[in-house]
Amino acid sequence: AIIMMGFSMGIYQTYFGVATTLFVLILVSDAETRNFIENIKEAFKYLLTLLGGILCYFLGNTICIRNFHVTLLDYQGINDMADVTVKSLIGSVKNAYIGFLQPILGEFCGISNQKAVRILYLAVYLMVGVLVLRRLCKRGGKLWNRIYFFVLCCLIPLSISIIYVMAVSDKTVIHTLMIYPYVFGLIYPIVLLEKEN
């Protein structure tokens, strides 16, 4: 999985957001089936897979750059992914959460240029909020598993919009090819509804 993630990032870095979102959704889906310690172990397994994929990507880039004497294009700051400061990271994370709301706030890469679509996104996001609150208020759940579930739910918008964090430039503009992970915003309620029954 690590090597495949490294290769997919080599093809197009936004695929990292797809993998990240899938991993977080799997963790959300399985959160109630394991105890807290098992959940943390599983989360670290996925985290190490993601970090390994990034490392594989950087290693592959380094090898290709040295052997083929090429340079990376400065495309929206993606070649500065490893040059992150705390300030730029905080700003990027903030932009990622704002980016998650873009389909509601206005036209976003052609997917929400109609008012009806923006209303649909708002309805889906509100439904997710209600389902998360229902799951958190459900009787019988252990406190640590609830906290774990809440943290994962807070990570969903970040994982969907992770491209904002990867491209550390303030001038990053998301375009159509970079929004594959946004599909998972619409799938998220299905994951939560599946566990309701």
What do these predicted regions represent?
Residues 6, 10-178:
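Transmembrane catalytic cores of multi-pass membrane glycosyltransferases
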Residues 177-197:
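Cytosolic-side transmembrane helix boundary signature
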